């Protein structure tokens, strides 16, 4: 009984499109900007090669901001898909 209700509530899977990619890129840019303003020690060790290319971030800050950006992006994509916008 519960399984049939769960299957009836399931939506169609979202296919990748350039719109999804653009949303993910924008979400990551927002997360990196937010991280640049709020991370206390952005250049913590281990350092990345070509620090200027990565905005002076160390590996922990870069991983943290991009992970946060992916969480934001997935939330946006799934939310917009659920609303029927994409």
Curated annotation (Swiss-Prot):
Membrane topology summary: Multi-pass membrane protein
One annotated Gene Ontology cellular component of this protein: plasma membrane-derived thylakoid membrane
Localization per record: Cellular thylakoid membrane
Record bears the keyword Oxidoreductase: no
Keywords recorded for this protein, A-Z: Membrane, Photosynthesis, Photosystem I, Thylakoid, Transmembrane, Transmembrane helix
Top-rank lineage group of the source organism: Bacteria
An individual GO BP term: photosynthesis
Membrane-spanning residues: 14-34, 60-80
Predominant subcellular localization, coarse grouping: membrane
InterPro entries: PSI_centre_PsaK_sf, PSI_PsaG/PsaK, PSI_PsaK, PSI_PsaK_bact
Propiece span(s): 1-8
Family listed: Belongs to the PsaG/PsaK family.
Assembly description: The cyanobacterial PSI reaction center is composed of one copy each of PsaA,B,C,D,E,F,I,J,K,L,M and X, and forms dimeric and tetrameric complexes.
UniProt xrefs under HAMAP family: PSI_PsaK
Protein name: Photosystem I reaction center subunit PsaK 1
UniProt organism field: Nostoc sp. (strain PCC 7120 / SAG 25.82 / UTEX 2576)
Encoding gene (name): psaK1
